[in-house]
């Protein structure tokens, strides 16, 4: 317990609690949780570009998202299927790393790049466009306006939401892979792609990688957020 206390601060715990509360508020929760969906679907899209094509991405009000891609070979399909949950966990880790180093502007620019790429190239449904424009405006505001403490707190909320969602969404897919193995999203897709690895193992893999990134964050001390 003492070792854990040395790795986190009360401020980190406070923002995790805030993230959990915010993501469970009707309507608002779905709106802010979409940031994780954006990262997840962007992960699929970016990896699909290596030997494949991204047709469209749809972002829906219920926080679900769909990336339509085509691939020229098996490996492209395989790595595209893995990329979604991996990107969610990695960007959550990266966000806290930047915040712990007080490098706020690079983090905002990275998040803006995700928004810009999707708005210009892939997202075409009405809600997806609305969400990207509104959230993109927030990032632009953070980039040019606001005190350091305001920017840090806003980014901490976003990073905390990404961390919470990366863990809960991968846990959900783990549960679905056992309860509904034929309707467990990426786990089902990878089971069909690999044929010999069942959805349950992919569900375990997705959850394990999210835990691994969280543990890596603890070891790196990136959750020790100063005032």
Give the predicted meaning of each segment:
Residues 1-4, 47-52, 146-149:
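Short, mixed-charge, low-aromatic patches
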Residues 1-2, 222-227:
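Membrane-interfacial, low-structure loops and terminal tails that flank and connect transmembrane helices
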Residues 2-43:
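N-terminal signal-anchor transmembrane alpha helix
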Residues 5, 13, 57-222:
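Metalloprotease/metallohydrolase-associated module, dominated by Zn2+-dependent proteases
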Residues 11-15, 47, 51, 188:
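Short low-complexity stretches enriched in small and charged residues
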Residues 26-77:
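Small-residue-rich helix-interface/hinge motifs
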């Amino acid at each position: 317990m003492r070792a854990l206390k040395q790795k986190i601060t009360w401020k980190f715990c406070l923002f995790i609690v805030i993230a959990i509360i915010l993501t469970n508020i009707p309507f608002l929760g779905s709106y802010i949780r979409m940031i994780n969906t954006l990262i997840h679907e962007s992960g699929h899209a970016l990896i699909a570009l290596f030997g494949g094509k991204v047709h469209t991405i749809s972002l829906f009000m219920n926080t679900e998202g769909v990336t339509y891609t085509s691939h020229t070979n098996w490996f492209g399909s395989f790595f595209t299927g893995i990329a979604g949950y991996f990107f969610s966990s990695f960007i959550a880790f990266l966000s806290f790393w930047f915040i712990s180093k007080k490098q706020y502007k690079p983090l905002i620019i990275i998040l803006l790049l995700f928004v810009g790429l999707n708005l210009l190239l892939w997202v075409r449904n009405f809600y997806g466009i609305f969400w990207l424009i509104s959230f993109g405006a927030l990032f632009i505001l953070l980039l040019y306006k606001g005190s350091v403490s305001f920017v840090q707190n806003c980014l901490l909320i976003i990073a905390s939401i990404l961390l919470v969602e990366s863990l809960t969404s991968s846990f959900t897919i783990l549960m679905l892979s056992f309860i509904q193995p034929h309707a467990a999203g990426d786990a089902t897709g990878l089971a069909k792609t690999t044929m010999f690895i069942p959805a349950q193992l992919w569900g375990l893999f997705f959850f394990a990688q999210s835990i691994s990134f969280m543990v890596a964050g603890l070891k790196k001390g990136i959750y020790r957020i100063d005032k």
